[in-house]
Amino acid sequence: MDRKELLDSIKHQLRNSVYTDEDFLQHASHSIDELDEVLNILFERLTNWYSIYLPEIQHADRRETYLEVVQIYDKTDPKTAEKLSERAKALVDTIEGESIGSVIEGKDLEILREYAVKLKKLYELRSQLESYRDYKAKEIAPNLTHLLGEALATKLIVYSKGLKRLAHLPASSIQVLGAEKALFMHLTKKTKPPK
């Protein structure tokens, strides 16, 4: 083997050993968790802000429905209710009589609608990341995924820092994966043990 072939071989080995599919799965899982935190904060901000305009729908059962109402509905124009889906119409119909919210027009309403559009895009990104995570989990650990489902299989792989390490862990260690904080509290402060 000459020097160039040897270097190419080493580069190939390094490339394959540095980043594994498990790394991509781990990043996807962490991205979903972080995106959930961000989405919760942003959605709460939107509901607080939009409740100035339409406080009656603040406690919608589904976020997608709420975002649709924010994007489309205008309480000063009843025709906008016709553009809503059935679920969103039902939510708007819960408002008895005239809304007690303030009148918001122009740029103020426009920015709320744009906020809802961007938030919806983030929910779509989260959905894409979930699909990718599920695909990767099935690719990496089909048997584990079949037994536990994609989300839980991913969490186990991520918490154990790899599928190979997970395979070598004793059952007692697997039981407390993700419950380190609860186990520490139990051992130091005599609280209830993690289940």
Regions found by a protein language model. Name each.
Residues 1-120, 142, 175-176, 183-187:
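Structure-specific DNA junction-binding interface
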Residues 122-140:
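Phosphate/ATP-binding catalytic cores across multiple sugar-kinase/actin-like superfamilies
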Residues 158-195:
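Phosphate-backbone recognition surface of nucleic-acid-processing proteins
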